[in-house]
């Protein structure tokens, strides 16, 4: 098994980490096996990355036969779109390293918890936007093939988890057009 950390540089000078839990293939048992992968996006209100939604989740997926990756994305004081671009890069990295990490590049899912659910849903809904294409990303390479949302922050409207949007947007927290853009419903 491989356990490693890849650094992702944020556009604001921050550093995210992609932590991999990868099952190696055995020459005795299907040495060319490709496994599905899952990118785990912990919650924490864009203030922290919850430990309980990180490695414990990765180990459960690993035990189920997935190559598991945890994104420790940048939180406060980083603001939108830093974490979105970090998740975009993480999805791209998983597919770029599919051979090395024994990943079936057509079966890469994402799971997000709370604010991490917002981040995962956000990438899924904007993966083909011009901003990401202009940054050099192929929409097909960054959009998850499946999405699991666990108690996600979805709306920025009346029922919003205000703390998550305050942390994500900082001074832009009252910008109606930005709030609308980031409201996933």
Predicted regions and their residues:
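Alpha/beta-hydrolase superfamily serine-hydrolase fold, recognizing
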Residues: 1-185
């Amino acid at each position: 098994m491989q356990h490693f950390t890849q650094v992702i540089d944020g556009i604001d000078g921050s550093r995210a980490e992609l932590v991999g839990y990868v099952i190696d293939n055995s020459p005795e048992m299907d040495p060319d096996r490709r496994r599905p992968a899952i990118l785990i996006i912990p919650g924490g209100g864009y203030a922290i990355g919850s430990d309980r939604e990180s490695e414990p989740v990765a180990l459960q997926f690993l035990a189920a036969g997935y190559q598991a990756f945890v994104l420790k994305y940048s939180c406060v004081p980083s603001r939108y779109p830093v974490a979105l671009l970090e998740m975009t890069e993480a999805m791209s990295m998983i597919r770029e390293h599919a051979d090395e990490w024994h990943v079936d590049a057509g079966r890469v899912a994402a799971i997000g918890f709370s604010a991490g659910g917002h981040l995962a849903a956000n990438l899924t809904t904007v993966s083909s936007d011009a901003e990401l294409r202009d940054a050099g990303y192929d929409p097909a390479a960054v959009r998850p093939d499946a999405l699991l949302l666990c108690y996600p922050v979805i709306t920025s409207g009346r029922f919003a988890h205000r703390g998550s949007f305050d942390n994500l947007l900082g001074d832009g927290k009252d910008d109606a057009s930005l709030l609308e853009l980031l409201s996933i419903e």
